[in-house]
A protein has these predicted regions:
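Surface-exposed, low-hydrophobicity beta-strand/loop segments enriched in small/polar/acidic residues
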Residues: 1-153
Length: 153
């Protein structure tokens, strides 16, 4: 589980396609190609191994899964989308997530920066984009409350 149910969603974006398996709570970036109109691959989002210089698209509110729907039914009670479908992304609001880089100990008020693999950190390295602000430290289970504030693109 990468997101706890305690959250406040102000603005979401459901116009982008994701073609890789991801967990809820990961911050994704815009792919370098296209717009996504007509369900093509141009407005795709992806997980960045090095987010330096990339534009964050939002925090994933659903899991992207790769299942064979001809062999099993989709579980509509889970927050999951199939690869190649539109993905709901949080662009403004706060969530409680465990997608925090290892060894990071943020405090309330620290800026939240995107680091590798969709995780968050409180230290900015060369070119890593700011995605919001930590609203508290990491608890005993590894979760932290984070306010995401991304410009509408």
């Amino acid at each position: 589980m990468a997101l706890k149910p305690d959250r406040n969603i102000v603005v979401t974006d459901i116009s982008n396609i994701c073609n890789i398996a991801i967990e809820k709570g990961e911050v994704l970036v815009f792919s370098v190609s296209g717009s996504g109109a007509l369900n093509d691959d141009v407005a795709t989002v992806t997980r960045a191994s090095n987010p330096s210089g990339l534009v964050p698209a939002g925090l994933s509110l659903a899991d992207m899964v790769s299942i064979d729907i001809t062999r099993q039914h989709r579980n509509w009670h889970k927050d999951e989308q199939l690869l190649g479908e539109k993905l709901p992304l949080l662009t403004k609001g706060w969530v409680v997530t465990n997608k925090i880089a290892s060894g990071v100990s943020p405090a309330a008020g620290d800026s939240a920066y995107l680091t590798s693999n969709g995780n968050l950190t409180d230290t900015q390295t060369s070119g890593t984009p700011k995605v919001g602000q930590f609203l508290g430290g990491v608890d005993a289970d590894g979760y932290a409350k984070v306010f995401i504030d991304l410009p509408i693109v």
